[in-house]
């Protein structure tokens, strides 16, 4: 993988679902903010040449880092939604990032992406006409619930995947799609959805389950366990 890419990390969320007074991306994990692990995991790949972190307006928790692993680390202010923050980050990328360049978008609270998974995403995504996302096939049995909470049926899972990040797409296509979705009042839940709305079909690249997102306190405990295994 020789093509250099920038990564956009939306980190303007307040972590309301987590239930902490501190946004979860800044929660201390073994003495360091959670987001530091995320940034280091991305910067560890030689093809990642810079990172753009999108923070909330007036964010006092951000420590004004300017580099990670010797790579430039820039910041900009985000929006009310994740999609708005991603758009802000894409528009704020430096001039060295061209319209047709591939860009990674990665959750700030997903600190455990494996270098091997990142490598496979970049290899497959940059060779694909649209791009690619990391994902995990659904392996559990899925039940459809009725309005009263009882089971209405069982859903086939053979072609269902759980979307993870990073997600890799061309900058111009993401910008255009996010702008159109905002104008149409569409709630965007991930970058692949932006491509789908343009009639495009991104590639699914399977990754490890350990690339989970920190959403609950139990997830944080799980990540601390993963860190202990590295020692």
From Swiss-Prot:
InterPro entries: IspD, IspD/TarI, IspD/TarI_cytidylyltransf_bact, ISPD_synthase_CS, Nucleotide-diphossugar_trans. The keyword Hydrolase does not apply. One of its GO terms (biological process) is isopentenyl diphosphate biosynthetic process, methylerythritol 4-phosphate pathway. The record marks 157, 213 as: Positions MEP for the nucleophilic attack. One of its GO terms (molecular function) is 2-C-methyl-D-erythritol 4-phosphate cytidylyltransferase activity. The record marks 17, 24 as: Transition state stabilizer. Pathway: Isoprenoid biosynthesis; isopentenyl diphosphate biosynthesis via DXP pathway; isopentenyl diphosphate from 1-deoxy-D-xylulose 5-phosphate: step 2/6. Its EC number is 2.7.7.60. Keywords: Isoprene biosynthesis, Nucleotidyltransferase, Transferase. It catalyses: 2-C-methyl-D-erythritol 4-phosphate + CTP + H(+) = 4-CDP-2-C-methyl-D-erythritol + diphosphate. Belongs to the IspD/TarI cytidylyltransferase family. IspD subfamily. This is 2-C-methyl-D-erythritol 4-phosphate cytidylyltransferase. The gene is ispD.
